[in-house]
């Protein structure tokens, strides 16, 4: 790492001409160097700029203060990277770094010219940016004016002037564009430049449409981003996530195009079908009207309109489409609905319709229109689009954004780690300089009794030399003295807040002299280690605390924010507000005194007992007097007054931990044992002191920087805010304290809060006077109680302490507001103040962890979302202004197009507020309706562009970022372990006390009764036993002095707590004594059992809790195995578990009754070995065998399905179909008997015990009971009784029995049941959250939604005619068609308020509610148009908090819960390292494949040629291109095209048909009968046949079937095959892969959803079949038949249009409905609904389907997406294995799975990378040591395995995986078993080499013999002879050398042998033999 220059003021050097000359010299030296070693340069990476010294960042703290003369002056660059670049830096007062280019600006201003220097000074001054900021904001305000007055023109010029001035200054200071750091090199400056250029252009050049150009001024608002520092990063993140979205976008557009094509083919022109009047005037015919009608207006009078609708009623020609009323016929005429914008007539409109479907905006309307015009069967199209398009693609976008966010987070964490290391090195260097001095000084201070004053003097003398200090030491000294004199007496007051405070006053200014030697070093170390540990728990990595930290450790600002945001919501002293940021950002990370710091103390690691002498903490105090410990935690005292050793857990995982420890040891040895004389020598001591004071002052500096407030504040606080006047007062205070702090008081207050909330919730609209008075008195009482609580707490704790606790501040605010409200209660318009009382509800969070967590998550997200919200606000603002500037005028001018009365509609863009509302509505996902209006008044293109931009930028990206943040705050570990506080547990203590009291009473009673019966008390032993754990208090009480405990009231609480939890605690904490002390805050030990799933401590999690979780797991296992009693289609558990789960004797039933029963009633016990008992036992065994038989189960499943199916027939037409009715009645009886029989059989077989301990059996039991009761009632003739009727509807639950029978569904249900607790929790929290809005709504709108309407057309009377209720009643008496009516969904009471809020939150039916609210005037007054316009704000706030946050919380909770469940079930991934995962996944893929037999090449030459052509990749791609072209021609088609176009398209179509037929024929010729072995080929064949038939019989087919062209669209799916060939399409492949992976899970969820829909459809049919047809219920969409109910329910699954279906059901009495109406053909009377049933029905369905099932869908997709992305980044993917087998097929045409050794080299060279081994590859292949079977053949698996290993590298897990894989493969291909390997490639090579060596040796031997025997004449001949073999050998040796011997060796030695151990030797041996052979060979050569 390039070290930074030595920190401190010396590092600042003025930038002078010499500096410039030096830089130039360096540059020339560099260039000279570069010429010398050009080659080297490529290899090495150059230095990188330091990220802490980037322009725009704060100067790192380590540099200290800037010397006064150097502020705003050019200085030499501090970053070594720029040493040879022409740059200099300037620092402003705020220590921000500005970097400039040192070349002359604009070629004339050098860095030393006065003009440039002045420009630089202006530019870096903070006021300059403030001025620009203010200008921008003022400018924004002016832009929002819709009709600006004349004088604003001049203001405009001023703005332009200021912006020009700003740019001029920047250009003068920086230069224009040549070189780094000049004006145009910063992209943000481009924005300024463009804005200014446009300003001048529009002013001086006449460009026609000025308003469009003027909208460019809006971009000025974007400048805020460049001025505010945090925003740039967020925008960066946004841009990143948009980049990541590119793949999803491509996929989305592709899918939408395909769907749009299908829509175009199916529904072209259908939406023009309208109901046309039959009776025409004499001379009129249909044709004549069509031809003569010039405009839509003329046709209108002939069409049929439903009341209140703009468009004519649609109809269709098929039987299941919408029919026309009497007197009308269905005709295709006029334009499409919604101004003609909703249609499938051309590809573009179809695409828009599908985009709308995907975003689910008002899609129910499109759905209803299409089904009405085309027929109900087309529901299938919508199901596919909604599930694939909408759910899948939209959630993929979410997944991608979340991952981008997560990656960014990871990157930040990495960067932080890096910083930490650099920082460590830097500090080490500082330490070395100051270490000895420090040690000596500290020792001197401790061991001598020199007067304070001398020390002070010394430190003063040294402060001049201090490099870092800049504050006067005198100030500090004086303050220190004063502080010391003020040591207060009444400190140690038991309360833990007092404990933390006690350290504050005295040691605030204690110098580091008071720290022990080690203590002093520790301040340093603490600084390093604390940031690493999460402030809330030890859980997770070292850096978990920095999870959200964005900035570096060095920078002063910013870091604190992140830490603060992660801490406890309520007790966070370092709140996120105010200017304390710079204080909190310092290098110290404060220890939070009021939090459980699990991470500081343990007894695991000990360090020598060196501690601050006085045992006080070094601490700093902020404005509220909050103490932040700077040094370690408080010293712990032993009873004898000694100090306990302080212990630090170094739970470090990074590399610095080791060094820290060594340093600590080294330092201790050197510094602690100082020589005596050194201490006694005053001179030495003085020197030590002066050097040490340097550091001292640094520490002081830090503390000052961390102080929130000026010193006088502390003096004031200690004088006035701590009340210790007289001893009596103190006694009184203690008494009050004892009372107020008692848990029972807390319980009482909590009960009061709940009651108060109830009282507030009881307000409703028509209230009696008495009720009002009761509520008023109640309010007074509660206000009194809370005020009293506050006063008493103030007395008990002193204001100083009282306001340290977040909750207390909160309480005091609410009490104050309540009191103010009491006095202002009668003032008109202040009733809103009452809603402040509602905040009391939040006090519940104190004792309700989930609510607390929710608030924390919202707090956290708001912290992190602060910047994001700003960006969102800027985006909304920009678009609102753009809309207003572009379309405002058009709305005014063309308003008659969209409104008959020519008044502006509610949604328009004529002024800023309304424009803002439209943009906000688009962000909520409702864009299509306002867009139609916009397109109608302002033209299509501009509106489409603007709306799409808002939609994509705003809705998709920002809202998803919102979600990503929510999810990340969920997954961050510190929230899963809910932070328990002392207060939070007070309730539990109280409850425990009550329980104990009850138990005690029970016990005494029992003993008393037993005594009175004079029996020996049985229970005494038990009680002793249970009381026992409480005697082990040592477990729970960590080291605190007994003295302290007796003082501490909290201890008393502990006692209660501990004994209260008794045995449960005992279980979980029995063997954790060692950890006990650091689970909790050292000064307070509260033990709360932690659930194994959510424990804070990983250490505990691993071993201690394993026993616990095991028991959980086995329970789970038991449950699972027991589910077979009610279903034998059961999941076999993996491996060993299966054996465990089976009963001892599989075919014998268990005992009938539980042991308890048998003990009570001995008669239950039967002897089964003889007599009746034996017969009974035989019967039971027989029953058991029957029930356990698989056929029995299948039969029952069939019966369940049949009986459920039977329910679907009972619709309103059943009365007309008599035979079906009779059949159903009999069937019903039969089913009931069968199910009763099944139940009895199971009772006999399993016994009651087993049957009734199984939840699924209970379900069966209850459902059978219902059938039984209805059966009995029917036979007795009571079938028409009300209760019996409602019981009959419960039969709808029958399908639930299918749940336990289908594995897939059961898995989903189990997962859901697991999630229910957390879902309920979140639901409750949401209800509390919404309660506040609901009560507020009741206060604002109760009784104000009434209006006086004209019942004939439903219009409202204007206020001029009817002003209030009494006038309306007067009118009613005059005419019959007037009515004073209320909105059905209103805020008249809290319950209805909830319903209204649900409609607002799901954005369905919210418009009516909002309009009523905005128009409301007063109770009993007629509403007035937009009278209370700003009531919109109430809804906006609710949507943000109530809808976005809480509904997204559901997603968060479900996903989080699934992950936790996965952990509990022990998903393999949790226990695998990254390496193992890689191998595991590769194996998973390998095992599933096997070589296939390729289609053999035909022998015929001609066929062979065609075969080669057809199997070529190019052929495939060509066909693909043709398919795409065919699609394009299909896109060109449109409704009503010319005949010529028809003709052209017809011939193009013919060409395509001929081409595809040609392809088909070619393939048939070459592939022969093998053609039909491939699925796609069959599909193509069918399409071709249909197309040919279709050419001749087009009319007929289209009339009766779907048009055959549709099948061609499906062929697009073939694109999936081509994606494999395109390397760039990896991202899209990943997405599709994720979809494939999710399909099984999604299918299960779909099944479950279908089941839910089925049950609800049956319920709906029996309850709402006869309701009045209005709003959403009409002739097609209703609950009359099963099909119609399903159509309605599918629509509500996405929560679309449920308000319309609910509205008619809310009609409960005339005049809304007619209770006496007769329905012909049925006995039912009336068409009124049942409001309560209706509301329950729809709300429960929405919660189940919309919130739960749909969110499970999301969870699955997110999960699989992350898995798929992981897989795509792995070195070997599925495709590589596919490729391997494709190549294999060529080498092994008969699919023998073996290949000859001789072919291996070619095979390896034929593969694609990464498996490819290019030639020459012989040696590498030999070294792989592959097993061979007879005939020198090698198995494909062995080859693949070896190649895989080569790619992945060696891993220890290989062997086990290998065997797993083989097992898998064997089961897939039994053929392999017969071949046992005989040898291996390596062994074969060794044998060959050995053979040659033996041969050679033998030859030599023969040769020698020869030489001896024969005379020298023959020697030449012999030589020539001998050369032959030698030549061969040398050739082989050469080969060996050329192919890099190292490589061979490495592979040989690193690759482990395969699993055929019998054949091969172990590695080591093999390697050695290799070596010896080589040596032999070399010896041979040398011999020769």
UniProtKB/Swiss-Prot annotation:
<feature type="compositionally biased region" description="Low complexity">
    <location>
        <begin position="461"/>
        <end position="471"/>
    </location>
</feature>
<feature type="transmembrane region" description="Helical; Name=S1 of repeat III">
    <location>
        <begin position="1186"/>
        <end position="1210"/>
    </location>
</feature>
<feature type="transmembrane region" description="Helical; Name=S1 of repeat II">
    <location>
        <begin position="745"/>
        <end position="761"/>
    </location>
</feature>
<feature type="transmembrane region" description="Helical; Name=S3 of repeat IV">
    <location>
        <begin position="1575"/>
        <end position="1596"/>
    </location>
</feature>
<comment type="similarity">
    <text>Belongs to the sodium channel (TC 1.A.1.10) family. Nav1.7/SCN9A subfamily.</text>
</comment>
<feature type="transmembrane region" description="Helical; Name=S1 of repeat IV">
    <location>
        <begin position="1513"/>
        <end position="1532"/>
    </location>
</feature>
<dbReference type="GO" id="GO:0050965">
    <property type="term" value="P:detection of temperature stimulus involved in sensory perception of pain"/>
</dbReference>
<feature type="topological domain" description="Extracellular">
    <location>
        <begin position="146"/>
        <end position="150"/>
    </location>
</feature>
<feature type="topological domain" description="Cytoplasmic">
    <location>
        <begin position="1249"/>
        <end position="1250"/>
    </location>
</feature>
<dbReference type="Pfam" id="PF11933">
    <property type="entry name" value="Na_trans_cytopl"/>
</dbReference>
<feature type="topological domain" description="Cytoplasmic">
    <location>
        <begin position="1758"/>
        <end position="1984"/>
    </location>
</feature>
<feature type="topological domain" description="Cytoplasmic">
    <location>
        <begin position="967"/>
        <end position="1185"/>
    </location>
</feature>
<feature type="site" description="Is directly targeted by the spider protoxin-II">
    <location>
        <position position="826"/>
    </location>
</feature>
<feature type="topological domain" description="Extracellular">
    <location>
        <begin position="928"/>
        <end position="939"/>
    </location>
</feature>
<feature type="topological domain" description="Extracellular">
    <location>
        <begin position="205"/>
        <end position="210"/>
    </location>
</feature>
<feature type="region of interest" description="Disordered">
    <location>
        <begin position="1015"/>
        <end position="1040"/>
    </location>
</feature>
<feature type="repeat" description="IV">
    <location>
        <begin position="1495"/>
        <end position="1793"/>
    </location>
</feature>
<feature type="topological domain" description="Extracellular">
    <location>
        <begin position="1662"/>
        <end position="1684"/>
    </location>
</feature>
<comment type="function">
    <text>Pore-forming subunit of Nav1.7, a voltage-gated sodium (Nav) channel that directly mediates the depolarizing phase of action potentials in excitable membranes. Navs, also called VGSCs (voltage-gated sodium channels) or VDSCs (voltage-dependent sodium channels), operate by switching between closed and open conformations depending on the voltage difference across the membrane. In the open conformation they allow Na(+) ions to selectively pass through the pore, along their electrochemical gradient.</text>
</comment>
<feature type="transmembrane region" description="Helical; Name=S4 of repeat III">
    <location>
        <begin position="1286"/>
        <end position="1302"/>
    </location>
</feature>
<feature type="compositionally biased region" description="Basic and acidic residues">
    <location>
        <begin position="489"/>
        <end position="509"/>
    </location>
</feature>
<feature type="topological domain" description="Cytoplasmic">
    <location>
        <begin position="1566"/>
        <end position="1574"/>
    </location>
</feature>
<dbReference type="GO" id="GO:0043679">
    <property type="term" value="C:axon terminus"/>
</dbReference>
<feature type="topological domain" description="Extracellular">
    <location>
        <begin position="1211"/>
        <end position="1222"/>
    </location>
</feature>
<feature type="compositionally biased region" description="Basic and acidic residues">
    <location>
        <begin position="1960"/>
        <end position="1984"/>
    </location>
</feature>
<feature type="intramembrane region" description="Pore-forming">
    <location>
        <begin position="915"/>
        <end position="927"/>
    </location>
</feature>
<feature type="compositionally biased region" description="Polar residues">
    <location>
        <begin position="1946"/>
        <end position="1958"/>
    </location>
</feature>
<feature type="topological domain" description="Extracellular">
    <location>
        <begin position="1341"/>
        <end position="1392"/>
    </location>
</feature>
<feature type="transmembrane region" description="Helical; Name=S6 of repeat III">
    <location>
        <begin position="1430"/>
        <end position="1455"/>
    </location>
</feature>
<feature type="region of interest" description="Disordered">
    <location>
        <begin position="26"/>
        <end position="55"/>
    </location>
</feature>
<dbReference type="InterPro" id="IPR001696">
    <property type="entry name" value="Na_channel_asu"/>
</dbReference>
<dbReference type="GO" id="GO:0086010">
    <property type="term" value="P:membrane depolarization during action potential"/>
</dbReference>
<feature type="region of interest" description="Disordered">
    <location>
        <begin position="576"/>
        <end position="609"/>
    </location>
</feature>
<feature type="transmembrane region" description="Helical; Name=S6 of repeat IV">
    <location>
        <begin position="1732"/>
        <end position="1757"/>
    </location>
</feature>
<feature type="topological domain" description="Cytoplasmic">
    <location>
        <begin position="1626"/>
        <end position="1638"/>
    </location>
</feature>
<feature type="glycosylation site" description="N-linked (GlcNAc...) asparagine">
    <location>
        <position position="283"/>
    </location>
</feature>
<dbReference type="GO" id="GO:0043179">
    <property type="term" value="P:rhythmic excitation"/>
</dbReference>
<feature type="topological domain" description="Extracellular">
    <location>
        <begin position="1277"/>
        <end position="1285"/>
    </location>
</feature>
<dbReference type="GO" id="GO:0019233">
    <property type="term" value="P:sensory perception of pain"/>
</dbReference>
<dbReference type="GO" id="GO:0001518">
    <property type="term" value="C:voltage-gated sodium channel complex"/>
</dbReference>
<feature type="transmembrane region" description="Helical; Name=S3 of repeat III">
    <location>
        <begin position="1251"/>
        <end position="1276"/>
    </location>
</feature>
<feature type="disulfide bond">
    <location>
        <begin position="896"/>
        <end position="902"/>
    </location>
</feature>
